Amino acid sequence: MLMLFHKSAGQNITVRVNSVNDKKEKVVYATTAILRNTDSSLIFTQTSNKETVFLLKNNTAYILKITAVNIKTFYQKLFTGSNDTTINVVLQTVSKQLGEVVVNSRTPLLKQEDDKTVVDAEQLAGSSTNAFEVLEKTPGAIVDQDGNVYLNSSTPSTIYISGREIKLSAQDLANLLKNLPANSISKIEILRNPSAKYDAASSGGIINIVLKKGVKLGVNGSVDVSHFQGVYGSEAIGFNVSNSKEKLNTYLSYNFSKKLNGEDLSSNRYTNTGGLFKQYAFTRFNNTNNYVGGGINYDVNKKLNIAYDVRISATQNNSDVNNNISISSLRTGNILGKNISIVNNEGPSLYVGNGVAVKYKLDTLGSEWSNTLDYTYFRSNSNQDYSNVNIFPARNTLLGDGNILNNKNILAYKSDVVLKTKKKFTIEIGTKLTYSLSKNNSVYFSDTSTGKYVDRLQTNRFRYTENIAATYLQIAKTFGGFTIKPGVRLEYTDIKGRQLIPADTTFAIKRTDLFPYIFIRHKIAKIFGFSLVGNAIYRRSITRPFYESLNPYQRYADQYTYDIGNPRLQPQFTTNYELNVNADEFPVFSIGLNDIKNIFTTLTYSRGDTLFRTYDNLGTNKEIYMRAVIGIPPGKKYFFYAVTQMNIMNYKGQYDGVPFTFHKSSFTFFLFQNYKPTKTLTLSLNSFMRVNTVINFFELKPYGGISFSGNKSILNKKMNVILTVNDILRTNKNSFVINQPNFVADGYRFYDNRRIGIALKYNFGLKPRAEKRQGFEIPQEIN
């Protein structure tokens, strides 16, 4: 224990730490950390080749921790006295060869950090081919087949990639995630109740997919090859590489993938006139994608850091739909009509996201000023051909084609200042400006016996701009076992939309809203060695109508189904209240209420023989949720965690102009198990089940899935062979029922989810030596 001399209470002193190895050589890139003596939680950390300097409170007990490659982790009690001091540490060298890793560590799979849950995505990536599948296996995240991801409520969450919001439709976002390689993800951060620092338009919470970047350990990387086979197959090949010098860190990743998949959709729709519409549609998807990600990170000096990163995803999309429809009388059973609709869509899409980040350290207390400027570009160009063959009664075949062009440009600037005072106040203040421009141009033609003509019903040109200016302030202070963090966010919204074709129509939304936030933490007790901490959260948020939900043009699905936006859609507001308990940074239990007003969602309206899928405001929903997490801390060979969540929904409002109430309780179960029979073999089993699920008022019958993964290290742990089986029992199928005013239907929807796959991963260069950690953690293979 290091004893320093007493000076006077309530002041800070400077502590300098120098470290060398047992050969008296300077340790390269040593990470020096200051931990709390009471619970070993992290206070400060620095990685440097030189002397590290900390400003610490005098007459206080801490823990000093130092880690580095090929160095045994160093721990020592530290008690600050009254005078500045310098600590010289000799670290013990551990003999290793380049490219080898001794796996004697435990990497946390699931842990709580303040107001966010952090999931180690690398544990899930081994049994996944893309980011979408990783999200499906993420504990507490509920993914529907349209690509929406849910956390606490019936409102979809907002998706971020490396801290940048992805402003795409659910379908475009799902396509982007399905083309993002699973092995490019480092971790997933789940913010169920984001603070005032984050955009208020995140009523459903935030999921931040953090991509891998280079680490300061010289040259290292991996090469990956995989093939998955179900009814259809998919394959991918790619690499990740990073290179670091003393101040410069660069990284690059590339992935090529080709995916084939199929979807079965069967539905029965019952009309008010006693008719039955039976529909069976099969869709075959064939997509190829090239993904490139890279970045550069430069330490100008000890205080200033500049970084640039870019992500490019280029996809060739192809789909073929074969839709069989029959119309009959429920009373007599007579066939009234029968036809086949064939639709082909093909075309490229391009996503480019890039940004510059500048971070400046203001002092040694941890204060900093960060600025980011991001530009996102998305373009899709789809050509569609369709034909409607009327079998009974026999009529002329209807032929048509169209071109759908979408362009999005998003520019965002954000500035954040974090001030940490000597009296242990943390003050955060910042601003964000976002400009978004979206353009849609759809041109359709109908082929008739007399020629080819413009289809004025489907042809559309639409322009949409969105300007959002925001500023926030929040303050955090810990005293007497309590941490209190109140905050407030002010946002100004200016939205304009103009349809030029088929008719010149405009709409505009201008509004200013205030969003308060309160976070209170209190240490409850210590039971069986676990420190229990309770949190209370209050938050107000908004869900704004987005471009696709407002665009009034009719998009053709088949001759009986159209997708159409609603330019009269109004924002939805959510007030959230939550109490939760954590045990040693592990989430244990949560209970909360989402009070949602002016709710809007996807709805299906029936107009005679035609269905319109649109968006509309319904009324209110008071949703109660409860979530519990249990697990066995990892021993030498076995670990598991289980998550149970219950949602109780109470809707009240109008559906298609008819008053309605809707009450439903749904349950979700997750289970992850990991078994390590040898030092080089890890087996994992991931399963989930959902009961009484409701999505956009479609009530789903119980469904779920079981996935297995085996990970074997070979070639002195330089290569991993991963065998995966997804949806073993083929139970991940949605059977649905909807019974609402003017719309009654049932059916099922099924993807080619059951797949067996093999992946090879070769690791090269210098890898970080993992550390031994405590709590709810899982053994990790080399990655």
Predicted features, each with a name:
Residues Y280, I410-K414, D455-N460, Q570, ...:
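Outer membrane beta-barrel strand-and-loop segments of large Gram-negative receptors
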Residues V210-V223, N261-R269, K278-Q279, N287-G295, D494-K496, I527-N576, I591-D609, I728-P741, ...:
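Surface-exposed extracellular loop regions of Gram-negative outer-membrane beta-barrel proteins
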Residues K23, T31-L35, K65-I71, T86-A125, ...:
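Short, acidic, small-residue-rich periplasmic hinge/interaction motif at the N-terminus
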Residues L55, A131, K137, R164-R192:
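Short acidic/polar hinge/loop motifs at secondary-structure boundaries
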Residues Y291-T315, V343-R498, A525-S531, F586-I591, ...:
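Face-selective signature of the C-terminal outer-membrane beta-barrel domain
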Residues D84-V90, A131-V134, L173-L176, I190, ...:
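N-terminal periplasmic accessory domains that precede
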Residues N406, N460-E466, I542-D595, R613-I624, ...:
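Outer-membrane beta-barrel signature, preferentially recognizing the C-terminal barrel domain
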